[in-house]
Amino acid sequence: MEVDTATFVRLHHELLCAHEGPSIISKFDAIKKVKLGTLANQSGGVNNITEAFLAKLRNFERKSEAYLASDLAERELTRDTHKAIVFVTKSVLLGGKSLKDLLPYGVIVCAFIFIPETASVLDNVPVMIGNQKRPLTVALIKYIAKSLNCDLVGDSYDTFYYCNSSAYGKNLISVSDNDFSNPQRALLSVGDLCYQAARSLHVAAANYIRIFDRMPPGFQPSKHLFRIIGVLDMETLKTMVTSNIAREPGMFCHDNVKDVLHRIGVYSPNHHFSAVILWKGWASTYAYMFNQEQLNMLSGTSGLAGDFGKYKLTYGSTFDEGVIHVQYQFVTPEVVRKRNIYPDLSALKGGGS
């Protein structure tokens, strides 16, 4: 599926800068101005500037947006020890990885900037920067840094992108100031687009709705699969809310702020789903990036209404049994038109009616 790369990058840039612009500037500023040498050399004391920006980074650390080694003042610093900024999608952390797992070698102070899940669709579009192959996602990172007047490379720090694709030999990709030519058009896989939709919904479920913080009584991660249905538009959500509440009174709770329908009570593996969530990324990203014909394909049986609309992802939980296995199934307007809203989820394979 062909997409205009400038539109794709600009859209995600606007989304990220509108919501996280000041935070991004603050992280770059803090990483730039924290002088690690003054921490190791306690005889001269820590200067006030380093103290202030170190406090900022510790505040980001409390929000799981930065990492600082616990013994900074005792470190014997070498030229191989430095600071970093790492761009990454939040879904990387949901499977159980920690921020420490994402650190570049030798880095003891790092700030993390989270990009939208759908932006990583560009991971599979390679571009050449010098003699190195890099994912086109770096174009978004460079655009963000340039528009916010942030230096990607400083005298004591570097910037990286944690890429999910294995096509570049390693996950941590360095992002330099070197210019390169963006392709005007890029071919994106329908499968990749659908997968990123599921990952985006997964992040919303975990970090915004926080649906995994309190699992229903009777749910056992080692035995059960937690099922979530994703819908693309408010009208479909309203239909499912009204229909399910009328069909099974007292069995559901609708949160109209977070746009989610919860099944309440004891968990049963026989339930077709435990929650229905509006995936807002469809309206905020895909609807702007693609024409109507492409949107019809994405929401049809060759896309989200078929095999490409069902994914199993994991959430690193505090359960003794380990991670929670979550199945995401999209119910699209096409499925609703076929009046097949309440099937066993396996019946949706291939858009079955």
UniProtKB/Swiss-Prot annotation:
Domain of life: Viruses
A matching Pfam family: Phytoreo_Pns
Family, as annotated: Belongs to the phytoreovirus non-structural protein 10 family.
Listed name of the protein: Suppressor of RNA-mediated gene silencing
Function description: Suppressor of RNA-mediated gene silencing, also known as post-transcriptional gene silencing (PTGS), a mechanism of plant viral defense that limits the accumulation of viral RNAs.
Any GO BP: symbiont-mediated suppression of host innate immune response
Keywords linked to the UniProt accession: Host-virus interaction, Inhibition of host innate immune response by virus, Suppressor of RNA silencing, Viral immunoevasion
